[in-house]
Amino acid sequence: SEMCIRDRLLMAGMFVIATSLWYAVDYVYAVVVNQQKSLGFDWEHVYYVQAAVLPNESVECDTASRSDDEVTAEYLEFYNRLQHHPAVESACYTLMHFHYIWKNGSGTMSYDTLKTSAMYREVTPSYFTVFRVRGADECSPEELSRRASHTNDFVVTENTACRLLNPDINNMTVKGVELAGRFIHSGVSMRKDEPDSVRVAAVCENQKYNEYSNWSKAVYRIVQLGQGDFKISYGSIPYHDIFIRVKADADRPGFVESFRKEMKKQLRVGNLYLADMRPMSYYRNEHLADYRSDLYTYLAIAGFFLANAFLAILGTFWFRTQQRREELAVRLVAGATPHNLQTLLMGEGFLLITIAYIPALVVAYNLGISDLVETWPVEWSFTRFLIGGLVTFLLLWAIAAISIWFPARQAMSIQPAEALHGE
């Protein structure tokens, strides 16, 4: 019959709409889930301090040759003067590690027969207090810094530790903190005094590279400035970074200008000087600009899908209900109540959407297992599929209910004589 043909066309349209809407909902779900994951560090009140070497053309430059030991001594003096400023809460040194800047080493870590790749970074113990990094067992940054106080010790992120303890990433019974105190093979040797087998002093919380990325696997090699094989030359200065955490009550507008003015002479050590100083918020905003642009674009596309789904379903069910005005009025004349008719129409709509949604779910699941959906930073899982499917179905049903309720309510007001005339 004509009604059957219309219903089949309606279900075909619902299938296309449901699949497209699920894809949009799945992306939004992944974004929301990732935003719930902790960043793993605190960038507020943290500043990057850039030490640089006076150019040879400068009248203040001492052109006498310097050994690496002498340059290292200058660098240590620069660092010590910096951290003793009254406004500085703590300072740290890093090599191959700069939050929001793609500056990393990498290596393969192994424990027994298990291996995993991870970002390799070198930091002083105070790094964990400057960036407020907590332990995987939720210990304070100060306690984590105390545990990681020996040169060549390693601190690994929890996800790295879990990979080294168990190859099954879905096994939640294995805790990363169990790796603390054990020895692993780092696979990376940046300094002469670094042994191949290193002790894991502590396990820290998982860390993201930025707010829009997934947790990264990373290992931190502990260095103590001035100890062991730690050496710096003028040529290597750009690769070494210093960060300070400023006391909250001192971190006010104009702080950088006043700090640089006050410390200009104090931080002139040998041929080293304070070249630049910027808050981490500067690097964060610069780094996240492209991510935000992409996110807003994808969210706009998702919103476009949702708006189109709403209009398509609204128009379809509205037209379908309007086409049955006479039938509904006749049912009223025959003794049906408005509530009965509302229930009938809602039931029909629910059934049509459900029948159309089943094949749409099959297609959606196959899109997921075929990696045709975004799997970074949130991995594909059956739970993700179920939640996305449920949210999509509820959206479809809510839109359909609105689309049915308004025209059905109008149809209830038709006069019996008009209904019988139309019949």
Question: What does each of the following model-derived ranges do?
Answer:
Residues N34-F41, V362-L390, I414:
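Short juxtamembrane loops and helix-capping segments at transmembrane helix boundaries
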Residues E158-C162, R191-L295:
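"Rare, low-scoring activations can occur
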Residues S1, V391-E423:
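C-terminal membrane-exit region of the final transmembrane helix in multipass inner-membrane proteins
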Residues L114-Y220:
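Hydrophobic secondary-structure segments that place a key small or acidic residue at a functional site
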Residues R6-Y29, D290-E326, L351-T354, P359-V363, ...:
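Hydrophobic alpha-helical transmembrane segments of multi-pass inner-membrane transport and secretion
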Residues F305, E326-L372, I387-V391, L395, ...:
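Transmembrane alpha-helical interface segments in multi-pass membrane proteins
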Residues D294, L299, E374-F406:
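Conserved transmembrane alpha-helices of multi-pass membrane proteins
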Residues V25-T116, R121:
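Membrane-proximal extracellular/periplasmic loop immediately following the first transmembrane helix
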